[in-house]
């Protein structure tokens, strides 16, 4: 199953997050969406820490959303890289 870390657009607009979810749906690929901001302006520290660990990073500075992982756990990247993954 794909994992998509990002923002729920009802809370924080993220066109690329929406596009990633839409692409996976169109491709009929199961995915788990992990919302890193449950409330406006409030990050889920546990989910951010999980994501940073997966990426081997110690800071979220410069980190863009979404961040997508393949079913095997490998990091794909953002929406543009996800689109390339399916070409």
Swiss-Prot record:
An annotated GO BP: deoxyribonucleotide biosynthetic process
Domain Glutaredoxin: start-end pairs: 1-87
Effect of substituting residue 12 to S: 70% loss of ability to be reduced by thioredoxin reductase
Result when mutating residue 13 to S: 85% loss of ability to be reduced by thioredoxin reductase
Disulfide cysteine pairs (residue numbers): 14-17
Keyword terms: Deoxyribonucleotide synthesis, Disulfide bond, Electron transport, NADP, Redox-active center, Transport
InterPro entries in the cross-refs: GLR_AS, Glutaredoxin, Thioredoxin-like_sf
Protein name: Glutaredoxin
Biological source species: Enterobacteria phage T4
GN (gene name): NRDC
């Amino acid at each position: 199953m794909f994992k998509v870390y990002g923002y729920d657009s009802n809370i924080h607009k993220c066109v690329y997050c929406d596009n990633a979810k839409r692409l996976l749906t169109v491709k009929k690929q199961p995915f788990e969406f992990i919302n890193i901001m449950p409330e406006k302006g409030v990050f889920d520290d546990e989910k951010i820490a999980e994501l940073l660990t997966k990426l081997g990073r110690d800071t979220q500075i410069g980190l863009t959303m979404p961040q997508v992982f393949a079913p095997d756990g490998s990091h794909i990247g953002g929406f543009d890289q996800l689109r390339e993954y399916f070409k």
